[in-house]
Curated annotation (Swiss-Prot):
Keyword field: Calcium, Cell adhesion, Cell membrane, Glycoprotein, Membrane, Repeat, Signal, Transmembrane, Transmembrane helix
Principal localisation: membrane
Region of interest (Disordered), ranges: 801-840, 901-931
Protein known as: Protocadherin gamma-A1
GO cellular component: a single term: plasma membrane
Function, as annotated: Potential calcium-dependent cell-adhesion protein. May be involved in the establishment and maintenance of specific neuronal connections in the brain.
Upper lineage: Eukaryota, Metazoa, Chordata, Craniata, Vertebrata
Comp. bias (Basic residues): 921-931
């Protein structure tokens, strides 16, 4: 084997070697080798490593390989020796047919440099094929009158070899009538012709046997033979004649099968069988005979198989016309195949990278691509491109090779992968294209820091929270992937009130959930400022911080604290002064309280929980100011005890109470005289309170029983008197005065009333007059200190018992008692101001029974409730005895629940005031009652 060079001479050889080395370094030189055909597999072709300037061991390291297109590889690289060897047995006739020289072209790729080196290997022909004829025997007829010199074309032999190994000569067996003349054709092959040397005589010899031998020029010589049988017939003096000596037609390669391409025509002036012309192919290639069909009677030439411009661009054939007597004529037919764009470009990806990091610089090579189109001309010119919206570009190399490179830096967070469509299109009409897809994965690098969902966070936690309670959750996301996006959370250490932040809070490193490590106190601190850090797991790791404001929410965990009046250390109560001349609304004192909580939990409201004289004082709901609700009277006790409750608005509400002692006096000596009485009484123990409750319940039960008995007796008495009035028709001028007792739950005062009933014999109507009593106990609502007008009862109240009290008015809602004003011990009172007293009909009837019982006992002079003459009723049971001279005159109306009558005091009558009439509705008066 040797490398063939075009230049000769030592100097030229050296110059050529130097030029070859430079061309190889630039990747644009051609390397030429030659090898005989039919060489065994693995035969040496050339030292490719030496010609590339590389060492044999560098072939594998630098990725040197053969790049061939569209065929089985004929050659291979021996990585150990660095030589080019045959990959299989090579048949030159299979590769190149009759073409000379037979060149096999391919490229050597140096992958690390992405360089291509074109290589051409010439396949040298050897004499491995024998000349052959298409027919083993040839029979034809000749007229005996054929003139000498007539030429008869003989089939030519075919030898697949080329050069000297191809067919070189023809020989005809000896015969006195025939000789051989070989014509050199214009297109190359030799055409043997048999020449008639002397006239034929059928009677002398009817059949002539000849042998035509075709020999090549190889060593040793190979030859093939054709047996010829010539039958001598009678004379036919007119051979067929074609209308044209040569026929030419252009046919597109995509013509349908069976299309009539051409019609040849030959005529023979003879008659009968001598004038009948038949057509046949003469000396055509077997491939042409497979593609085209010639109708032997009509001369039509059609295609039996598709035409392929890429296989044959021109078909040349000879058509022979023969009459019935054996005379023949020949014509040449040329069929030129026109190329059409029927082949799409072929895209081959020679080398490709499937993954690239996102931080690789622009110009990174992704793939090496080759494009080929089997068409010719513009139909074979191709263009390769990719979509313009991709960060890639195609760079054209030599010999329709392209490389795909990055045009700019990739960003995985925007696009994590690309499906690159490579389109190859030719310039034919219509243009054909081919698409090839390359999938490229962009691998991630840690180039993004974690990002919190908010710029800052605010969290709220109620105080007194349990330890370990979940407070808040922060979340961050990382645009990276896999480990670069795995986030861990931590608190940036800080100091709060001398203690580390980790003593107060902790965070779950995986979920970002904050937990309280201690119970927070709103009164200690109200908010915490901290920073949370999110860090990914990349290399190197990236992090970001966010501010978190943790606000402690107040809970109602502090009761109100009363600042004034301050509790003395000796358990005594302070004394506030109120002159008896004070007008309603006079500011006695002010209860001052604070609450350590905040917001609604620190909103305070004040109310009078208990008072020794209900209705005398009022407390501002929001100010805590203690004011007089009415004018002070002489009968008001010097010492007034008030229990004020202060309550916040938390849930649940908390409260505190304070006891006030108010001294009512106009002069200082009055206060000094009774200074000893202002000492606070000792608190009864639980057993005394229980005893008082038992005694009170027993007393109420006895009074109720007495009330029932008295009520029955009263009803019987009224019924009896009404019968007497109806019978006698007389009149009653008066009735004995009765005594009524008003009960306020604290004291019972004996009150004497007189009333007069006037009746006539002819009329059942009468008028009942209620004069004012000596005094009346007054129950005033905390919400109002207004005086009420008196009520008068019409005679209808005294009518027959059979008439129902349908005109009875409901109790006036202005005379409702707060819970603090209801009868009972002080320990049974509560702060609910929504109820009314009496609560139900039972309580109302019980109170009426107590009043009637007390009145009956006073009228009979046998009352056991009083403490003696001039004393208050029930005083022996419920408290110390006081004379009537010490009891102040309230001059207020006393309303009996369940009745539409009002008891007026006697003072009104003494003052010359007539009782106001009414129908059960009270009239309000804003004027102060004069003494």
């Amino acid at each position: 084997m040797k490398i063939q060079k075009k230049l000769t001479g030592c100097s030229r050889l050296m110059l050529l070697c130097l030029s070859l080395e430079l061309l190889l370094e630039a990747g644009a030189g051609n390397i030429h080798y030659s090898v005989p055909e039919e060489t065994d597999k693995g035969s040496f072709v050339g030292n490719i490593a030496k010609d590339l300037g590389l060492q044999p061991q560098e072939l594998a390291d630098r990725g040197v390989r053969i790049v061939s297109r569209g065929r089985m590889p004929l050659f291979a690289l021996n990585p150990r020796s660095g030589s080019l060897i045959t990959a299989r047995r090579i048949d030159r006739e299979e590769l190149c047919a009759q073409s000379m020289p037979c060149l096999v072209s391919f490229n050597i790729l140096v992958e690390d440099k992405m360089k291509l080196f074109p290589v051409e290997v010439e396949i040298i022909d050897i004499n491995d094929n024998t000349p052959q004829f298409q027919l083993e025997e040839l029979e034809f007829q000749m007229n005996e009158i054929t003139t000498p010199g007539t030429r008869i074309s003989l089939p030519f032999g075919q030898d697949l070899d080329v050069g000297m190994n191809s067919l070189q000569s023809y020989q005809l067996s000896s015969n006195p009538h025939f000789s051989l003349d070989v014509q050199q054709g214009a297109d190359g092959p030799q055409h043997p012709e048999m020449v008639l040397q002397s006239p034929l005589d059928r009677e002398e010899e009817a059949v002539h046997h000849l042998i035509l031998t075709a020999s090549d020029g190889g060593e040793p010589v190979r030859s093939g033979t054709l047996r010829i049988y010539i039958q001598v017939v009678d004379a036919n003096d007119n051979p067929p004649a074609f209308t044209q000596a040569q026929y030419h037609i252009n046919v597109p390669e995509n013509v349908p099968l069976g299309t009539q391409l051409l019609m040849v025509n030959a005529t023979d002036p003879d008659e009968g069988a001598n004038g009948e012309v038949t057509y046949s192919f003469h000396n055509v290639d077997h491939r042409v005979a497979q593609i085209f069909h010639l109708d032997s009677y009509t001369g039509e030439i059609s295609n039996k198989e598709p035409l392929d411009f890429e296989e044959y661009k021109m078909y040349s054939m000879e058509v022979q016309a023969q009459d019935g007597a054996g005379l023949m004529a020949k014509a040449k037919v040329l069929i030129k195949v026109l190329d059409v764009n029927d082949n799409t470009p072929e895209v081959t990806i020679t080398s490709v990278t499937t993954a690239v990091p996102e931080n690789f610089p622009p110009g990174t090579i992704i793939a090496l691509i080759s494009v080929h189109d089997q068409d010719s001309g513009d139909n074979g010119c191709t263009t390769c491109f990719i979509p313009g919206n991709l960060p890639f570009k195609l760079e054209k190399l030599v010999d329709n090779y392209y490389r795909l490179v990055t045009e700019r830096t990739l960003d995985r967070e925007l696009i994590s992968g690309y499906n690159i469509t490579i389109t190859a299109i030719d310039q034919g009409t219509p243009a054909l294209s081919t698409e090839t897809h390359i999938s490229l994965l962009v691998t991630d690098i840690n180039d993004n820091s974690p990002v919190f969902h908010q710029d800052s966070y605010s969290a709220y936690i109620p105080e007194n929270n349990p330890r370990g309670a979940s407070i808040f959750s922060v979340r961050a996301h990382d645009l990276d992937s896999n480990e670069n996006a795995q986030i861990t959370y931590s608190l940036i250490e800080d100091t709060i009130q001398g203690a580390p932040l980790s003593a107060y809070l902790s965070i779950n490193s995986d979920t970002g959930v904050l937990y309280a490590l201690r119970s927070f106190d709103y009164e200690q601190f109200r908010n915490l400022q901290l920073k949370v850090m999110a860090r990914d797991s990349g290399d190197p790791p990236l992090s970001s911080n966010v501010s978190l404001s943790l606000f402690v929410l107040d809970q109602n965990d502090n009761p109100p604290e009363i600042l004034y009046p301050a509790l003395p250390t000796d358990d005594s109560t302070g004394v506030e002064l109120a002159p008896r001349s004070a007008e309603p609304g006079y500011l006695v004192t002010k209860v001052v309280a604070v609450d350590r909580d905040s917001g609604q939990n620190a909103w305070l409201s004040y109310r009078l929980l208990k008072a020794s004289e209900p209705g005398l004082f009022s407390v501002g709901l929001h100010t805590g100011e203690v004011r007089t609700a009415r004018a002070l009277l002489d009968r008001d006790a010097l010492k007034q005890s008030l229990v004020v409750a202060v309550q916040d608005h938390g849930q649940p509400p908390l409260s505190a109470t304070v006891t006030l002692t108010v001294a009512v006096a106009d002069r200082i000596p009055d206060i000094l005289a009774d200074l000893g009485s202002l000492e606070p009484s000792a608190k009864p123990n639980d057993s005394d309170l229980t005893l008082y409750l038992v005694v009170a319940v027993a007393a109420v039960s006895c009074v109720f029983l007495a009330f029932v008995i008295v009520l029955l007796a009263h009803r019987l008495r009224r019924w009896h008197k009404s019968r007497l009035l109806q019978a006698s028709g007389g009149s009653l001028t008066g009735m004995q005065s009765s005594h009524f007792v008003g009960v306020d739950g604290v004291r019972a005062f004996l009150q004497t009333y007189s009333h007069e009933v006037s009746l006539t014999a002819d009329s059942r109507k009468s008028h009942l007059i209620f004069p004012q009593p000596n005094y009346a106990d007054t129950l005033i609502s905390q919400e109002s200190c207004e005086k009420k007008d008196f009520l008068s009862a019409p005679q209808s109240l005294l009518e027959d018992k059979k008439e129902p009290f349908s005109q009875q008015a409901p109790p006036n809602t202005d005379w409702r008692f707060s819970q603090a004003q209801r009868p009972g011990t002080s320990g049974s009172q509560n702060g609910d101001d929504t109820g009314t007293w009496p609560n139900n009909q039972f309580d109302t009837e019980m109170l009426q029974a107590m009043i009637l019982a007390s009145a009956s006992e006073a009228a009979d002079g046998s009352s056991t409730l009083g403490g003696g003459a001039g004393t208050m009723g029930l005083s022996a049971r419920y408290g110390p005895q006081f004379t009537l001279q010490h009891v102040p005159d309230y001059r207020q109306n006393v309303y009996i629940p369940g009745s539409n009558a009002t008891l007026t005091n006697a003072a009104g009558k003494r003052d010359g005031k007539a009782p106001a009439g009414g129908n059960g509705n009270k009239k309000k008066s804003g004027k102060k009652e004069k003494k």
